[in-house]
């Protein structure tokens, strides 16, 4: 089985249609028969006919990453930081609605190729994490985060970790695990179906 979630990739004034593939699974009794490859080939064919420009997914393991690479998917980089001890809380942190977060996020990411999330995507993400506006001195940003015991899991912080202390004002924690744009850690994978190719697309949420 596989599911395709329609999304949009944006870069400045450019945008194109993408399908986020998730829950790609083969029953254990039918593995190693090429069924997954045939399923993805069928999805690619059908989505191309529907004028989608690319496919994105997030592999759960390194072995799956290698497998998807053999099918033409290319890893897109992002940055992960295990901060260890959380920084001292300082600055201003305000709770945002999904609509408010969408607007602020697009402003911050305007110059970078990224997946633009619709309100339905963000409302689903809001069932797992909160959205926040951050201010620290002259620095402004936004974040999506949730506590996990004594660790603050930051699903996204923009434009970078410079505004992380402000997030701790709303969500105190002893440790932080952070994802942000840039860096060289492989995360999402992308396969282009058209000539609307964009470099290193940033995808934040795997909706896992």
What positions do the PLM features span?
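Conserved active-site alpha-helix within GNAT-family acetyltransferase domains
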Residues: 52-54, 60-78, 183-193
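Conserved GNAT acetyl-CoA-binding A-motif
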Residues: 40, 47-60, 173-183
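Conserved acetyl-CoA-binding loop-helix of GNAT-fold acetyltransferases
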Residues: 23-26, 32-45, 70, 159-172
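Structural motif
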Residues: 155-160, 178-184
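C-terminal functional modules
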Residues: 185-208
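Conserved beta-strand in the GNAT
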Residues: 1-7, 18-20, 25, 56, ...
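Core nucleotidyl-transferase/polymerase catalytic module
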Residues: 5, 22-23, 43, 61-63, ...
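Amide-forming acyltransferase catalytic core, primarily the GNAT-like/NAT-type
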Residues: 71-156, 161-162
